From Swiss-Prot:
Assigned keywords, A-Z: Cell cycle, Cell division, GTP-binding, Magnesium, Metal-binding, Nucleotide-binding, Septation
Cofactor: Mg(2+)
Family per record: Belongs to the TRAFAC class TrmE-Era-EngA-EngB-Septin-like GTPase superfamily. EngB GTPase family.
Any one biological process term the GO annotation gives: division septum assembly
Binding site for Mg(2+): 46, 68
Pfam families, per the entry: MMR_HSR1 (PF01926)
Gene Ontology molecular function: GTP binding; metal ion binding
Binding site for GTP: 39-46, 66-70, 84-87, 151-154, 184-186
Gene3D superfamilies noted in UniProt: P-loop containing nucleotide triphosphate hydrolases
Keyword field contains Phosphoprotein: no
NCBIfam families: GTPase_YsxC
Gene Ontology cellular component list: cytosol
Protein name per its UniProtKB record: Probable GTP-binding protein EngB
């Protein structure tokens, strides 16, 4: 199926918010279409967003895990947004902050009406950790489709990559939801075209019939 081309390189920073309540004030929850990116600290989330948008500095990368503490919103075009959710799972972050982040993530995934797809990024060498699974279950409960990316795929040889991918696809069946598992490497571009196609399809599916008709009639 052909979808309207998305110009990811036009993405620009819109706002940051500490939680869903602040986000709702600036962007009504029913407005537009949002695709969220989430992952453990240093899973390669910021690098993936930068590669997708062809912008090295759009999402700030850091050698210090746990640096992303806010919900960061980027707009590609009016009504189409990418959401950079706080990184999670870093051991040196205080417990109170961990719990706050997890609460913020859960509320966003379960309550944000404009969310139409979730990309979960996991280091291919440490996939489907407990918090990754919790995130995916939250999304499934909210009827949100999930793309699970095994990042840093270039760190493994091709045979090991394929073996891990097949194993993780089998594990993903246990979620009993719409969970697709793929390889990804920001460095080598592995899986980039697939990511573009998936996000584009989510934007298309998230459009209301009236919006789609308006675009056709223009």
């Amino acid at each position: 199926m052909e979808f309207q081309k998305i110009h990811f390189q036009k993405a620009h920073f819109l706002i940051s918010a500490p939680d869903i309540r602040h986000l709702d004030k600036h962007l009504p929850p029913e407005s537009g279409i949002e695709i969220a990116f989430a992952g453990r600290s240093n899973a390669g989330k910021s690098s993936a967003l930068n590669r997708l948008t062809r912008q090295k500095g759009l999402a700030r990368t850091s050698k210090t895990p746990g640096r992303t503490q806010l919900i960061n919103v980027f707009e590609i075009e009016e009504g189409k947004r990418l959401i950079d959710l706080p990184g999670y799972g870093f051991a040196k972050v205080p417990l109170a902050m961990k719990l706050k982040w997890q609460k913020s993530l859960g509320e966003y995934l379960q309550e944000r009406e404009s969310l139409k797809g979730l990309v979960v990024l996991m280091d291919i060498r440490q996939p489907f950790k407990e918090l990754d699974q919790q995130l995916i279950y939250w999304a499934i409960d909210a009827d949100i489709p999930v793309l699970a990316l095994l990042t840093k795929a270039d760190k493994l040889k091709q045979g090991a990559r394929k073996t891990t991918l097949l194993k993780m696809r089998e594990e993903a069946k246990n979620f009993e939801g719409d969970v697709q598992v793929e390889l990804f490497s920001s460095l080598k571009g592995i899986g980039l075209e697939m990511l573009e196609q998936k996000v584009t399809s989510w934007y298309a599916q998230g459009e209301t019939p009236s919006t789609a008709l308006d675009e056709i009639s223009i």
